[in-house]
Amino acid sequence: MRCISILGSTGSIGRQTLDIVDNLNISVAALTAGTNVERMVQQCRKYRPALAVMATEEAAAQLQIEIGDIPTRINWGEEGLVEAATVAEADCVITAVVGMVGLKPTLAAIRAGKRIGLANKETLVCAGELVMAEAKHCGTEIIPVDSEHSAIYQCLMGNHSKEEIKRIILTCSGGPFYGMKKEQLQTVTKADALRHPNWKMGPKITIDCATLMNKGLEVIEAMRLYDLPLEQVDVVIHRQSIVHSMVEFTDGAVMAQMGSPDMRLPIQLAMTYPERKECPVDALDLLTCSSLTFAAPDMEAFPCLALARQCAKQGGTACPAMNGANEEAVALYLADKIGFYDIYDLVSKAVNAVPFIANPTLDEILEADKLAREAVRRVAKQ
C-alpha cells in the first residue's frame, strides 16, 4: 500500500490511524472531519493531503482561510466524503466516521475498488447485506478495524469454510458499569459512562459500550461480515480486554486472538494485510497479565444488548431503525437532555414506531433511519 484516505481523521480512530501512517511512512491522499477545524489544520499542514473535507460549509470555509497557503483542495458534506472515499491516489480507505454518514462513502469506495479498513460498524448494521453483496460483486476487500472483528478475521485467515465454524464468540469488557444492577444504573452520571476501563475511544462509542449497545451492533456486524445466523454469534464478558474474540470450530477447537488493548494493532493490520509490520504498541506480556476471566452478560441490567439481538433476528429495517434511534438517543444523552436508561426506552419505542420492511432497498433503509430519529426526538419531548 502506498497511499491512504482517512474518513474521520480528527476522531479517535482517525488520529490513531495517522500514528500508523507515521510508522509505515506512507502518504495521505485525503482527510475528512466533522467541525474540528483546528485539528484538521494541524493534520493538513503535517500530511499535505490532496483533499480535505469538513462536514459543514462553514467549517470548510474556515479551513480554507487557515490553510490557503498550501495546495490542499477543500470540499464539504456528503459530496466531499464520497470524493475522499474515491480519490484516485488512495489504495486504502479507512472509514472511521461515526454513524450512518459512513454508508454512502463506503459504497462509493467499494465501487472504486479501494481496500476498505472498516471502523464504521453502522454501515454493516444498517445495510450489511447490500454492502457485502456489492463488495463481492466488485471484488473489493473489506477488512474490519473493530478489535473484535479483526480478531475473528485473523482467526479465520486459514480460509476455513463456513461449515467448519460452530460459533463466533465476541468478547466484551462489560464497560464502566459491569456488575451493577438496574436500580444502581438509574443514578449513574455521564462522566461515569464516559470512563471506559480499557479503551480510549470517542464519546458516542464509549456510551454505546456503557449500555452494551456497542456489543449488540457488533453482533449484527459479525453476522454480516461472516454470513452467519444470530444463533452462531455469542457474547462473553472479558474484563481484561486481552482476548479480543474467539472462533469455536465444529471439532471443538477454539481459536482466539490476543493482544494489548490498543486500536493501532487492528488499524495497522487492515492497512498492511496480508503482511505484518512492526507496530508502535507495547507487546503483550503474558507473565504480567492478570488472570483471564469470562462471564455471561447481564441482559436484564443492560437491555440494549437484548434489543439488538432481537432486531438482528427480525432483520430488514429493524436494524437501521435501531441504529438511527440509538445515534439520536446517545446524542441527547451527551447533551444532558435524557438519562442513562432513557436511551434504551427511546430506542425500543422508536424501533416499534417504524414500519417494518423485510427486504428493504437502500432508500428504504435510509427512510427507516430517518423515521427512527424523528420518533426519538418526538418521544423525548413528551
Regions found by a protein language model. Name each.
Residues 1-382:
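Catalytic, metal-anchored helix/loop core of enzyme active sites in primary metabolism
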